[in-house]
């Protein structure tokens, strides 16, 4: 059994990494929906920020999420596509980019850091989301977007 808490973050939509590094404040603003899954217990829980691939969220992702919950970890699903009125980027990788999803992940991290139920925060992703998890460890990005993640899995 687990609890789901929904929250939103104010994010940005940079087209490419260069825009994060040079002019993030001039990129379009967007509100991104997130779902925080909490395992049984009191916490604080380690948390995995989870990012989908180009097909968006699929049923098999829930198997991984359930595994993390069963292991006592919280999971934060970020809905980067739906929040931008996109279902998939399989045929158009430019409609939602990994740069946009990077900002979403760091903005969600900022909110989670304030939650007393959450301890250390890692990041994981599938396919496109894995690219985000990889770039989230790059120091120039971390210096601009916020605190580093405690773990990375892509």
Language-model segments: which ranges?
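A conserved short beta-strand
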Residues: 144-154
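Short glycine-enriched nucleophile-adjacent loop
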Residues: 130-143
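Alpha/beta-hydrolase active-site loop
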Residues: 94-116, 135
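Surface-exposed, active-site-proximal loop segments in enzymatic domains
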Residues: 86-95
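Alpha/beta-hydrolase fold nucleophile elbow
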Residues: 117-127
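Short substrate-entry loop that stabilizes the transition state in hydrolases
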Residues: 43-45, 50-87
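N-terminal cap/lid segment of alpha/beta-hydrolase-fold proteins
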Residues: 1-42
């Amino acid at each position: 059994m687990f609890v789901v808490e929904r929250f939103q973050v104010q994010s940005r939509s940079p087209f490419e990494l260069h825009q994060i590094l040079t002019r993030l404040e001039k990129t379009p603003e967007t509100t991104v929906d997130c779902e925080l899954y909490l395992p049984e217990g009191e916490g604080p829980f380690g948390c995995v920020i989870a990012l989908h691939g180009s097909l968006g969220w699929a049923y098999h992702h829930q198997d991984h999420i359930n595994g993390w919950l069963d292991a006592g970890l919280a999971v934060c699903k970020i809905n980067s596509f739906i929040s931008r009125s996109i279902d998939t980027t399989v045929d158009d990788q430019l409609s939602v980019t990994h740069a946009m999803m990077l900002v979403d992940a760091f903005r969600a991290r900022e909110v989670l850091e304030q939650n007393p139920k959450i301890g250390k925060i890692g990041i994981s992703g599938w396919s496109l989301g894995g690219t985000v998890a990889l770039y989230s460890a790059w120091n120039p990005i971390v210096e601009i977007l916020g605190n580093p993640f405690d773990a990375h899995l892509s």
